UniProtKB/Swiss-Prot annotation:
This is Histone-lysine N-methyltransferase EZH2. It catalyses: L-lysyl(27)-[histone H3] + 3 S-adenosyl-L-methionine = N(6),N(6),N(6)-trimethyl-L-lysyl(27)-[histone H3] + 3 S-adenosyl-L-homocysteine + 3 H(+). Its EC number is 2.1.1.356. The gene is EZH2. Residues 180-222, 340-426 are annotated as: Disordered. Residues 345-357 have a biased composition (Basic residues).
Amino acid sequence: MGQTGKKSEKGPVCWRKRVKSEYMRLRQLKRFRRADEVKSMFSSNRQKILERTEILNQEWKQRRIQPVHILTSVSSLRGTRECSVTSDLDFPTQVIPLKTLNAVASVPIMYSWSPLQQNFMVEDETVLHNIPYMGDEVLDQDGTFIEELIKNYDGKVHGDRECGFINDEIFVELVNALGQYNDDDDDDDGDDPEEREEKQKDLEDHRDDKESRPPRKFPSDKIFEAISSMFPDKGTAEELKEKYKELTEQQLPGALPPECTPNIDGPNAKSVQREQSLHSFHTLFCRRCFKYDCFLHPFHATPNAYKRKNTETALDNKPCGPQCYQHLEGAKEFAAALTAERIKTPPKRPGGRRRGRLPNNSSRPSTPTINVLESKDTDSDREAGTETGGENNDKEEEEKKDETSSSSEANSRCQTPIKMKPNIEPPENVEWSGAEASMFRVLIGTYYDNFCAIARLIGTKTCRQVYEFRVKESSIIAPAPAEDVDTPPRKKKRKHRLWAAHCRKIQLKKDGSSNHVYNYQPCDHPRQPCDSSCPCVIAQNFCEKFCQCSSECQNRFPGCRCKAQCNTKQCPCYLAVRECDPDLCLTCGAADHWDSKNVSCKNCSIQRGSKKHLLLAPSDVAGWGIFIKDPVQKNEFISEYCGEIISQDEADRRGKVYDKYMCSFLFNLNNDFVVDATRKGNKIRFANHSVNPNCYAKVMMVNGDHRIGIFAKRAIQTGEELFFDYRYSQADALKYVGIEREMEIP
């Protein structure tokens, strides 16, 4: 027993030694191969240079060299002096004109930056990409700065790869090399040195043969455990095992990963569920900024399950022609029954969703007898869980049940809502391709019972064929989302009282949380009110239109009902330091046409991008400055301060470097994030600091995002340089900006 315990303790240590030994050997081989490649490329380039040089020499020998004309006098050239070049040899004296260049003042130093027109969220940098050069003076004053800077990044510096760098290629080679060892060799340390040397020679002799052949069996778990212990930042043993499988799988050329769906326009298109067809669109589409793969919101909000209150254009349901499906017996009753079912079906609240991969079973091809996902609303094609249904005695259903990409439940309430009346004419036997069936399932969630519109979009099927295909799949297609039943209108006096109470609540919240502004994340707690457990309430934020709470939520901001310009505290949006929302503020002009230049609402400039023309030129105060081209009035919007959105921790790390440079572009956005315009930004980043500024900065909530607006503090004339208060302390202001601009009479 003692011997067994000793051996079990020695096993992991032995495997760690093997990992280290093989890793160092592979690294050395990689360096040798790299050196050989460099030598080979150097020799090849040198040979090409010699060949090219020889060709040029031959060309120069064949050319006629024309002598240079020698000037004898430059007296005819004004503003020049004569310069003579003499030689002790028999060469004639050469005379050339000498032109004097006047001294020109150098432009201020400018560090490289990338222009942006909107904020760009970036991840924290956990590795120091480069050690900044501060100059000898800074290092002499603070010799420990570089050491402290590296400690802030936990000692991780880009390029420091000693015994810590392992890429996919080395990882696969390392696992294959360790696969040569047997599990019974854990007690190698107990052998004599001569026996260990003989074993090592045998491994080296047969290593080339074993590495050239594919492994006979999957590597032992001990190998991945040992690698994980040596490289803990690369993942656990199970993660390394899965990574090895992915890297070593032999896939056919052009084969798609299991979670991918073939192109619907390609020859390999399959009949799949609506959720699978729209997976990429649902995953990449951001419903806050209406862009695909946006760079501002890392977590995409779940689409709202409630319909908008504005009216929608009704589709034309007249027959499209003499062969329209509506001429069939029972067709109109079938469509009317679908509409009635939609009205009486209660809406289902969705769950939250983040970016992710498809479920493993969703990659299998589906058949026409598969449950399509439940549509949630008409305002957006949302993704929902595809659901297979309950009990079905049909033999064909049982045979194809394993092929479904759906999971559980709602088919018990998604069975055929009505029984189809038998048609006089028999249905056409038309074959549907995978692309057509997939496209039908996508469109049915938007157009529902308008089969004429679906047929026009598909293009290869008539509305009658689409109708018959819909009848065939009626037992497995989920019903359309329920239409909201309008609540009875409140009395006018009660509505005004609620609105006044709401405005007072805005003022109280503004006064109580002026120093605590947190980033907004939409709340998503289905069937629960926004109480003390709601994330919006906890962060002291209003519920926005992106939240999943009810439209009657007491914490939801309803917008304003102003008739004027929304530039005084009489406007609830202006009072709450928000821009008017075009989806909520329908009377002030914020919802006017986007291309309209004359907008009555003056509280929507940031979201519309109504910035002024700015000019960049050297400043009389410090470095570069920004100047206004056209005059602006007091409180008029000038520009948005854009840059990288970074966390507070990342801002602290970057700020220590910026303080040494005595140049910082950090701007607090809220308690969670900071805008850094050092690397990326717009021209307003060059506006200098002043204790008597002509501009002021204001952080505003714009459609759920905090954004920084620069406004005129007074009337500014053409050509004036722009300044705003950086809110430095008195010592920092003298250290960073040593010159204060002269007072200007407004």
